[in-house]
Amino acid sequence: MKKIYLLINSLELERGGLTKANLQQASMFSELGYETYILTFNYNSDYNGIIEDIYDVYKVNKKVKIINMYDYFRNEDQIDQKFKSYKNLINDDSIVEKNDSKDIVKIYENGLYKKNISYRSDESIKKIDYFNNSNYRIKVEFYAPEGYIGKLSYMDYNLNRPRQMTFYNSIGNCYLRKTVNPENGLATKVDLIKKGQIVHSFRSDRQLKSYFVEQIVNNNKDSVIISDARNTDDIMINIKNENSSKNVRLHSNHLSPNGEIAKTVMTSLENLKNIDSLIVLTSQQKEDIVNNYGYSEKVKVIPHGIQTLPSKDINNIIRKNKAVVISRLVKLKQIDHIIKAMQLIKDDDPDFILEIYGNGNELENLKSLVKKNKLENNIIFKGYTNNPLEIYNESLFSITTSKSEGFSLSILESMASGTPVISYDFKYGPEEIIDNNKNGLVINLSLIHI
């Protein structure tokens, strides 16, 4: 049976289109009968709980196997629960400063700041930062939910960044050690350890990650490897397995807003000769890449797909007097343009509502802009949603104002719900998805007033 391995650096619950697409294609491959794996590479002590929720929330086929690199090298099937409450670490004579909004307590001993304890909602310890008498952070302990220390970081006093990291199993044995350059965060030496002995050494994290994939794939002749994230492209390219098909799947525009090739995709584009295929989302993107790099036979077009709601008579859906935006709240998405446009809509229809779903580092700036324009009664921030189709289903229209995309899942989801889309004419997607003036509008970039 052909085995498929999807590479993505990390998985979290509240993620955007790339994660959705990764999980969806994994389920599809599994349902078609392929043995399917998702391989992740980041350290997260809460991964087991996150993965359980991901299967449930994203409806991932249970046959899909999700394997994390650190869990693989830790090599433990079952762990005894050793629950530790952060309260057990507080001495009677300690001074405690609590920050309820961040689930953090600061511990002072004899007047000196000694510890910073982060904890989970069940009061289990998540992380402890230790400080010396000169207030330098000296080390950080990362606790698994089961109560053991899974990772230790020893800090550079001046830069306040790790110099050395050690990773432990549930009985306290070190299975991995890293020496890190604190100036750039890159590992300069990585040791795999078994029974107290170094069994493999690497000069970088990338070498470790490629080795991890090689161990999983195990030179299988019928294996297909797909790199779904740009920070896994070089991992896949450097895998020493001639029998595997190596494929890169782009989920975004390969061009920067200034029209130059984005640095994040340079690895894959410059290694077209070393991979079997580059999968893009639109015919226009393929044409642009082939014109610059050639290899037409290797560049394939496979658009995103979505799971639709049960069939309904779109004409009989009762829609509310509102528009909707579902997006990461980052500068690239230009949500501020929509907020400015809402001022114009409000003048014509004071009761019209805009709902904005999503999270991101622009959230507070966008809230401030809403307040500045006195739009608090017309624009509502709703947070992250796992039910985009239902939300689109009750809206008059949706709006997309990105500078660029690889292929906008939000446009596809909106149209699947029978909800028209107003979208900027960015590369790539709107022109190929929207039938202008029939099921939506494609307008010039940055045209706030239509």
What spans do the regions from the language model cover?
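Conserved donor-binding/catalytic core segment of Leloir-type glycosyltransferases
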Residues: 314-333, 339-342
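A short alpha->beta transition loop at the rim of the catalytic pocket in nucleotide-sugar-dependent
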Residues: 389, 396, 418
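Short hydrophobic beta-strand element within catalytic cores of glycosyltransferases
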Residues: 420-423
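Donor nucleotide-sugar binding/catalytic pocket of nucleotide-sugar-dependent glycosyltransferases
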Residues: 247-249, 255-258, 273-291, 295-310
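Short acidic/histidine- and often glycine-rich active-site loop of Leloir-type glycosyltransferases
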Residues: 426-427, 431-437, 441-442
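Aromatic "clamp/platform" in nucleotide-sugar-dependent glycosyltransferases that forms part
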Residues: 384, 403
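Conserved small/polar residues in nucleotide/adenosyl-binding loops
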Residues: 448-450
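Short glycine/serine-rich donor-binding loops of glycosyltransferases
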Residues: 408-411, 430
